[in-house]
């Protein structure tokens, strides 16, 4: 059951983050290049600015293959003075559900010529050994005093699936228990709708991934806009079909890869 707590979702999300910054905890924004993590990042910049804690920590694990405009957007993020960007790559295997004979491919596979990669990691990116995505945010990578918490901020929203709603309920709030590395996850926009996300981006004139504009141009509705790896589930076929029309040269490069 939803409860009206007498505050709008924007102010509630901002308060959730500002409280953590004011307590001098370490907060790391997981930035995928998508709209939800973009909103989390912009809210974190506002909260950290109010608390005198700029720049904010942002991390992105490179997936090599995401829609065009995604990494151009992330380059702009990395160049912002309010952001301490950690752009990492791990060479992790990725499921390819469309190829039964060769069901995995590797991000920036060092066993093939670099020229065969869809794109190159940016100069400011660095390689990490940990392939487990839950190992991105650690106290070693983001030094944190022993008496303070470290949080990974993610753009989870319960509107997107019943499983996410149940996960939020089971953790009894927008902050999880610490994982095996002592990191808690904070989900400041869990109660936002798609409309809330786009309203904030429009009202505050925030920069965003312009791949979304291309998706809309090709008939995608607001609740169908997603930035995600393309080969991990059968749902990716619709994204590949869109890419074939929207970015034919890029699609050919991905197909060859």
Where on the chain are the PLM-derived regions?
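Nucleotide-activated chemistry modules centered on ATP-dependent adenylation/adenylyltransferase
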Residues: 1-30, 35-257
